[in-house]
């Protein structure tokens, strides 16, 4: 499966032998990301699970077994990380400070950069799907408005079309840089000297820890 918004159990309904149906979810970029989720559908059997574990270990990846639910495990936590970055952006925190505080907290890339890598249009599709499948208050309307502005009005899809939160130069012609137009999308801009860097760092860590605890509570 290529996305954590496709329920494995639903996909298996069209398969005659549902006990042999199992999800294997990789992360992008695949060549760098060691984690692989193995997703159990409602009727997945032990033989299918064992085969999936063997396959993932054979290619040198680290498998974890999760139950079928929206976002599985990892993307629920990653989604909260990205959402917190968007929340800071809407609060008026300078984009560069958002990115740097996240990296200072130990994250390999900032949430805005990660959004670009995942693709902003995909993020918007997930927001819309969540809103349709659950209830309107399951999503943050301000974050949806931000994604609609970036994707549908500005045509900024992320790295894949060389413009998202960042501008991407042609290969070999410099480094990516935050899009200067971002400030116009912020309802307000806060003075960086008034912001507590430690608080911003902790926010990134706490939201992911809380979401991880929720996945345990939800039996993911």
Features from the language model and the residues they span:
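N-terminal glycine-rich phosphate-binding loop for ADP-containing cofactors
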Residues: 1-220
């Amino acid at each position: 499966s290529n996305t954590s918004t496709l329920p494995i159990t639903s996909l298996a309904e069209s398969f005659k032998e549902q006990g042999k149906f199992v999800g294997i979810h990789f992360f992008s970029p695949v060549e760098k990301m060691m984690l692989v989720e193995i997703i159990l559908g409602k009727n997945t059997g032990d033989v299918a699970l064992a085969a999936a574990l063997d396959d993932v270990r054979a290619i040198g990846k680290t498998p974890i077994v999760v139950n079928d639910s929206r976002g599985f495990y990892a993307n629920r936590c990653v989604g909260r990380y990205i959402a917190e970055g968007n929340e800071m952006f809407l609060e008026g925190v300078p984009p560069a400070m958002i990115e740097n505080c996240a990296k200072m907290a130990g994250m390999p890339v900032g949430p805005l950069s990660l959004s670009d890598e995942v693709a902003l249009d995909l993020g918007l599709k997930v927001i819309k799907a969540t809103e349709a499948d659950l209830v309107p208050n399951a999503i943050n309307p301000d974050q949806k408005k931000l994604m609609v502005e970036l994707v549908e009005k500005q045509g900024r899809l992320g790295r894949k079309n060389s413009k998202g939160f960042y501008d991407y130069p042609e290969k070999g012609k410099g480094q990516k840089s935050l899009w200067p137009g971002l400030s116009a999308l912020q309802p307000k801009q806060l003075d960086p000297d008034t912001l507590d860097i430690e608080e911003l760092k902790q926010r990134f860590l706490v939201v992911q820890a809380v979401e991880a605890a929720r996945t345990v509570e939800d039996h993911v």
